[in-house]
Design a protein with these regions (language model features):
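Flexible, active-site-adjacent loop/turn segments at secondary-structure boundaries
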Residues: 22-29, 43-45, 98, 103-105, ...
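Short secondary-structure transition/capping segments
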Residues: 33-41, 115-126
């Protein structure tokens, strides 16, 4: 159909111009402007609290997997291209680099603060019923 505006996610961030679309506002830049330069939290890896003593092990396995991908970038990009939705190797590499990087391993102090702020805003707006407890594994 025809629409006046929309939000582009995933690969669309890199390919929207190929479809004749025009960027009106970058939500990441908007968030940073509105929130003292904090990064926009787009996702994260979570582990269920009821796993108890297994949490550190699961966290380490996730870290190891992410680190492997970072250290073996070509292999990781080639693997990810299976789901790349017609991206070139260069586009896939750029897209992966936007979301899988050193911040994936450690959000940093500003990243942790951004996650907390994001959830606080969601709670105040009634999007989530209560503020969840946050534990960041490093």
């Amino acid at each position: 159909g025809d629409y006046d505006a929309g939000v582009l996610i995933h690969e669309g961030q890199l390919t929207f111009q190929d479809q004749g679309l025009v960027l009106l506002r970058d939500l990441g830049e908007w968030w940073q402007t509105e929130n003292d330069g904090l990064p926009l939290p787009l996702g994260g890896n979570t582990v269920r609290r009821d796993l108890g003593d297994l949490i550190p092990r699961v966290s380490q396995l996730l870290q190891d997997s992410i680190r492997y991908g970072l250290e073996n970038r070509v292999e990781a990009v080639e693997y990810a291209l299976q789901w790349g939705r017609d991206l070139s190797v260069e586009q896939a590499d750029e897209f992966i680099g936007m979301y899988v990087n050193e911040r994936t391993l450690d959000y940093g102090d500003d990243g942790r603060l951004a996650v907390k702020l994001f959830l606080e805003k969601a709670h105040k707006m009634g999007i989530i019923p209560e503020m969840p407890p946050l534990d960041f594994q490093r």
